[in-house]
Structure formats: C-alpha cells, structure tokens
Amino acid sequence: MSQKLYEFLSLQDDDDAKVDFHNTNLSGPSNVIIYVSGNWYDEFKVSEIISLAKKYPDAKILISGGVGRLTLPYVQRMGGEPLYLLERLTQEASACDELSSIKERCILCNSSIVTTHNVKFLMYYLSQCADMEGWNASDNSSKAYSKYKIIVVDEGFLLRRLKATILQQIEVHTKVKKDFPSSMIESLEFISPADCQTSADMSKKHMHGNAVAAFLQIGEFKRLVNYSTGNGPRLFSKELAGLHDTRAEEIWKVVSQLEDDFMDDLDRLLSIGDEKELKRAILPIFQNSVLCEGFDL
C-alpha cells in the first residue's frame, strides 16, 4: 500500500514529473538551473547533483535552505543546509577535473527555514536574470531573451509538494508581481536520487524502517491536503497539488489502510512530545548504515 502513496508523492507518472511551458518563443539553447531545496535528506542528493553537474557543465546550482526545526545538529554547526551541501559537493567533485569549478557554479541562500522561503530564492534569481536583460513589466518593449530549463532535485516523497509550491510561486511572480516573464521558463523537471525510487528505498534510510516511512509519507500527504484547502496556510491550489480528481480519493483510501496497518507504531510516534526524542526516532541514516552524529537510539 505504501508504494502507491509513495508513487503519488514522488511524481512517478511522467506527466507529473515534467512541466513544459509552451508559452516561450525564444530561440537558442536553454540555460540550465539545478535547484535544491534544503532538508535533512541533502546527503542523499549529492551523487545526483554531481551527475547533473557533469551532464550540464554550464548549469548553475542553486541551493536554498538554512537552519530549521529538523536540521541535523552537525549541519547546524556548519552554519546551515546550503553550506553543508556545498561542502559535500566540493568533496565529491575534488577527484574530477571537469568539476573543478563546481564551487563557483553554486549560488546559495542560507536564510530560509521553510519550503516556501526556499522557493522564493529561485524566483528571486530568475527576477535578477530578467533585470540584467532589461526586463521591465511596465515597458511593453522590454524583453527577456534567455530561457531556462530548471531541474529540481529532492527526496522522492517530497517532490509533489515542492512542485506545487514552485508552480504557485511562478504564477505569483509572473502574473501578480511581474518580476519576470513566464516566457523565460522552458521547462521544470523533478528528479529524485537513484536510491529513492520506492517506498522500500525510503524505509532503508530510517532506523525504524517501514513504520517511519509510513509515518512521514502520511504526514506529507496530509500536509499537501492542508496547504491546498485552507486548513493550514493555503500555499497552492488543489489542482497544482494533484488533488482535484479521483486520484485524491484513491490515495485517501491508501492512507487510511496504512494508518490501520501501522496503528501502534504511528500512535507511538505521534505521542512523542519531546522534539529531540522525535528526531531520534525518525531521522534518516546516512552512509554505511551509520546513524547521524549526535543521536543514539
């Protein structure tokens, strides 16, 4: 059952994983942006970002994040998620001559604590690109001549909410604020690392396996629902979240079944009141099954 929920959240339908903007008539090659919204899964994204950096040697790598509620202790000590990820990318690229300039290709925002703030950094970067080309919303003769292919990398089950957030912010910044023209964007592509293609892959990243994977996926789905219906901060529409058709009803049934299957485990996790103890229970495991520094289960 959890695989069906995971596939929905991780955009495994090709139609969900890529958005083509057919409103651009700009010719010439596209500029590529590799975009990363920071979280505690950043370690798992390193190899995918390195691979994309090799494939697109001129691509800029935008990394946004900071220190939030679930930022890992040693990442906090390094100064925040973008600084940690930059360090890891630099380490991995050091053995590859073609990536010797990877540090200079990275652009960081280290002041965000929530996904929406992370995404606004991407919008700000696009607006600066438009400004440098002379874009002016009040001047009908002004144009932006460059187009951008944006590749978004994140842990699989987080992609649907991130996609909805990005699409909503693009609408706000192109139609309301008019910070840049929508014709600048050629496409959005959403990618998860090779080792997080299934719910089973996700389970392997957590000490308590299937129970924690179910806990996090159920929580992510309910967050997606709340953010699109106004029960929480309404950050995007049900249509952008993919909750406007019969799929939503099907996924609710899956969630209900998972809650029944993992009732005892979910009750135990939901009853944890101490934030540090909750982190210990649900944080991911990194290389060689070594638990993140500073936590002892």
Say what each PLM segment does.
Residues M202-L297:
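C-terminal accessory extensions appended to soluble enzyme cores
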Residues M1-Q217, I285-L297:
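A structural signal for short, hydrophobic/glycine-enriched beta-strand patches
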